[in-house]
Amino acid sequence: DELGPWGKVNPPLRKRAVADELVAALARGDVDLIGSDHAPHPIEKKEGSAPPSGMPGVSTLLPVLLTLAAQGRISYELIPQVTSKQPAEIYGLKKRGTLSVGDEASLVIVSPNEKWSIKKGDLRCGKCAWSPYSEKPFIGKPEATMLRGRFLFSNEEFYSLKEEGVWLRVS
């Protein structure tokens, strides 16, 4: 309720106690993978009379997980397991999900102790320029992103915004 139309998502956001239990399940290893369900909508649509469900999530997934780790609620080692290794194994994506010789070098470099927050207007990529996490404190900041060995983001700059993805068949 505190987010108003900005928090309209499916399934709906739950009470804090339910979210805390989900974090505890993640910490116990009961959760196989984490995804962002990135569903952004422009400000004008979310402020309209019938706001659509969804919110941006891909840019805040890692900062949320890093903050949980900094707070001691999950381990840092768990983050690449549930965001990379296990999803690649579950979907049969070869040469992905680990950092090994011969694998795709897709990774994020972070400053694990940096305290920061998303300021209004910071989101420069995608179809919406807002975040449900605006002004909320994070601990741990993504500093650079590599895709298949190439930097896409570093030093607060995007090096490429064109489509870089490739179609992957799951096994």
PLM feature spans:
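Histidine/acidic residue-rich metal-binding segments in metalloenzymes
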Residues: 1-34
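A generic local structural motif
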Residues: 18-22, 95-96, 131
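Short beta-alpha connecting loops at secondary-structure transitions
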Residues: 7, 46-51, 128-132
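Short acidic, glycine/serine/threonine-rich loops at helix termini
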Residues: 1-2, 44-47, 120-122
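His/Asp/Glu-enriched, well-ordered alpha-helical/loop segment
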Residues: 27-34, 39-112
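C-terminal cap of metal-dependent C-N hydrolases
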Residues: 101-168
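Electropositive phosphate-/nucleotide-binding environments in soluble metabolic enzymes
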Residues: 3, 12-20, 52-62, 77, ...
